[in-house]
């Protein structure tokens, strides 16, 4: 019988080399997903932070429904956690930026799709022109960056 504190799998064995970035290497994580829709926003913000800690110049791109990840939230007031985990995505994005990562969010999605203003964003998020979404991706492709695309439908 297993009990609290037992390991069910081997966490000690690592199969692959622990890669670190070479100077100047870049990474981009894109999000076209609604905040809290499944676990993708949680998992890939953690992955983006891990890339940053491995030395990659890492950016996050929020576009389409992904901009909802960057909105300030809370209840009953902004910043108040209504229940444990309620602000996890916000906290992860803030931590990512604290550690030097950049977060970009599409202005078109913000206004046209969600009726929000740039003031709705977590401080530090950089609003961008909708034409910059593709150029951000192309810039990273040209730099041979690691790119993680996150989509939900």
Q: Where are the model-predicted features located?
A:
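A short aromatic-anchored loop/beta-hairpin motif
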Residues: 96-99, 104, 113-114, 120-141
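N-terminal beta-loop-helix "entrance" segment that forms/cooperates
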Residues: 66-79
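Glycine-rich, aromatic-bearing surface loops/beta-hairpins
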Residues: 137, 142-153
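A glycine-rich helix N-cap at a beta->alpha junction
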Residues: 78-112
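Short internal beta-strands
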Residues: 57-64, 103-107
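Histidine-anchored nucleotide/phosphate-binding helix
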Residues: 40-60
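Positively charged, low-complexity intrinsically disordered leader regions
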Residues: 2-23
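Short, glycine-rich nucleotide/cofactor-binding loops
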Residues: 23, 27-42
